[in-house]
Regions:
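Short regulatory "switch" loops immediately downstream of catalytic or recognition motifs
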Residues: 15-17, 58-60, 83-86, 129-138, ...
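Basic, Lys/Arg- and aromatic-enriched nucleic-acid-binding interface segment
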Residues: 24, 28-32, 43, 47-49, ...
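Conserved tyrosine-mediated DNA breakage-rejoining catalytic core shared by Y-recombinases
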Residues: 54-58, 77, 113-177, 182-189
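Arg/Lys-rich amphipathic alpha helix in sigma70-family domain 2
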Residues: 39-48, 170-173
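Active-site/catalytic core of tyrosine-dependent DNA strand-transfer enzymes
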Residues: 74-79, 161-232
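Hydrophobic face of alpha-helices
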Residues: 31-35, 48, 112, 161, ...
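Short, contiguous acidic/charged loop-to-helix segments that flank catalytic cores in large enzymes
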Residues: 69-70, 86-89, 145-155, 195-204, ...
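N-terminal core-binding DNA-recognition domain of tyrosine site-specific recombinases/integrases
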Residues: 1-44, 89-92, 201-207, 228-236
Length: 236
């Protein structure tokens, strides 16, 4: 490993795309794992620096693979989103996790990977120290895993505002009333905050599908109530 160079990493990523036809999202997952491994090599003195730093960014630059910049919701859009979720009988059970993500800025894997021990209700803080990921291997099957944040800045303590605190308390009460408990252990981690009715962790794909349906139905409701072609706020 001591003979590896930055060019070796770039060549490896290019080979994954050109010869194995992997998508950039898959290469991104591989980069996450590889970066952590090389970090360990640096700590043990086999390498002076992490030669995979910025390798994925450079790959995207050379192949023009940067996706369109995502825009944050405006305040009116946020208010519409929260109000619709809180009042919708069909989607109300999604309110706690989306409210938490909106009020903290946590990514999907950070939110779905939260454990109750990461929540400090006394000091109103949330510890973000790991990411829940989902691996899909043709030979090994599909399974969840736990990764460390991609950078040291990713490991952080987030203040818990009142709306997030209320959402978490609502989630705890909803699970108590429904008799739902966390019945899964992922890489030694358990007691996850957000679990489905089977006691398993939430899948990112499930959240994405739910979000698309929420946006569709919310916008349809707004348009149905609109009068005289007046401008309305819609979810993007």
């Amino acid at each position: 490993i001591g003979t590896l160079k930055r060019s070796d990493i770039r060549r490896y990523y290019n080979r994954l795309i050109d010869e194995r036809n992997l998508k950039i999202a898959t290469v991104d997952n591989i980069h996450t794992v590889l970066h952590q491994i090389i970090d360990l090599a640096v700590e043990d003195g086999y390498l002076r620096t992490n030669i995979s730093d910025n390798a994925l960014k450079e790959l995207k630059q050379t192949r023009n693979l940067f996706t369109e910049k995502r825009m944050a919701l405006t305040v009116p859009e946020q208010e519409l989103f929260v109000e619709f979720l809180s009042k919708s009988p069909m989607y109300q059970h999604w309110f706690p996790i989306f409210s938490l993500m909106l009020g903290t800025g946590l990514r999907v894997g950070e939110a779905t990977g939260l454990r109750w021990e990461d929540i400090d209700f006394e000091n109103n803080t949330i510890s973000v120290n790991h990411i829940l990921v989902y691996f899909n291997h043709s030979k090994g099957g599909c399974y969840f895993g736990i990764n460390s944040p991609k950078t040291r800045a990713g490991e952080r303590t987030v203040p818990m505002i009142e709306s997030v605190r209320e959402a978490l308390m609502q989630e705890k009460e909803n699970q108590r009333l429904a008799g739902i408990t966390c019945d899964v252990r992922v890489d030694g981690y358990t007691d996850f905050v957000f679990v489905n009715r089977f006691g398993n962790v939430q899948h990112q794909g499930t959240l994405n599908k739910a979000l698309r349906r929420i946006i569709r139905d919310c916008n349809e409701e707004v348009l149905d109530k609109a009068k005289d072609n007046k401008p309305v706020v819609l979810l993007p």
